[in-house]
Amino acid sequence: MSTTGELYLRIAQDGDRSIAVDQYHRGALRVFRPLYLDGTGQVAYYVVNPGGGYLDGDSYLTEVEVLQGASAVLTTQAATKIYRTPTRPVRQDTRASLAPGAVLELVPDQVIAYRGASYRQTTLVEMDPTATFMSLEVLTPGWAPDGSAFGYDCVRMRTEIRVGGRCAVVDNLRLVPGEAGMAGLGALEGHSHLASFTALDARIDAALVTEIGELLEVDGVRGAVTRVPGPGLIARALGDDTTRLTALMLDISELLRDRWFGAPRLDLRKY
């Protein structure tokens, strides 16, 4: 099946820093030149969609391979804006492979789903038991002409993570505003925005999960965290402000980056 845009990156360790030893892009996806945001040698790549938004039937494929001991952050230049999709949903597929000791952080800007939008996102991660994977997502409803809170049709986000060839996590998020009860108990519970943070690392234990749960205890936000096989964890937060939820997810990232790698808080320098 043809795609609107494709991106492939292969990251390896070269001395005291990580570099791309192979990269390819086609269509409506690009990457800026690599940046090194701190003194750890971790490489950061910014994915760019020159079109500025995702339209009816668009499909995108991103593949990232992180080789032994290498470390990378993949982010976006700006929010992922999903416009009206009258015939076919927008698809975003991400596939990642992590070798022994590899680190990958997926830190995109928020997904904004506008009125009439349908969006399907799948992420497949295959990782060595000694690797580290972290990702965050923030979903924001776009403005609707009639002022409705949820104008989009459907958002589906599915993440599957395999550790050492074994399926460790399947996280399937499905939001359909047209179905009764989406704003109620067990769904968004009166809030408009949703954030999620996923981490898999052999060092995750019950004490760390408890510590992250305490980070989520903030006014105006409903948050919780659960331990998953891997070992790993998934944190969710409901709120009404993109900036606040993103900062909260980055608080979790900061704790883990400092604890595991002695690395500072991510400063993606976009604005």
Curated annotation (Swiss-Prot):
Keyword field: Chaperone, Cytoplasm, Nickel insertion
Keyword Cytoplasm appears in the UniProt entry: yes
Compartment(s) where it occurs, according to its Swiss-Prot or TrEMBL record: Cytoplasm
UniProt main location, coarse: cytoplasm
Gene Ontology terms: cellular component: cytoplasm
Domain of life: Bacteria
A Pfam match: UreD
GO MF: nickel cation binding
InterPro entries reported in the protein's UniProt record: UreD
Cross-referenced HAMAP family: UreD
Annotated function: Required for maturation of urease via the functional incorporation of the urease nickel metallocenter.
Subunit structure: UreD, UreF and UreG form a complex that acts as a GTP-hydrolysis-dependent molecular chaperone, activating the urease apoprotein by helping to assemble the nickel containing metallocenter of UreC. The UreE protein probably delivers the nickel.
Family of the protein in this entry: Belongs to the UreD family.
Designated name of the protein: Urease accessory protein UreD
Organism: Actinomyces naeslundii
Gene: ureD
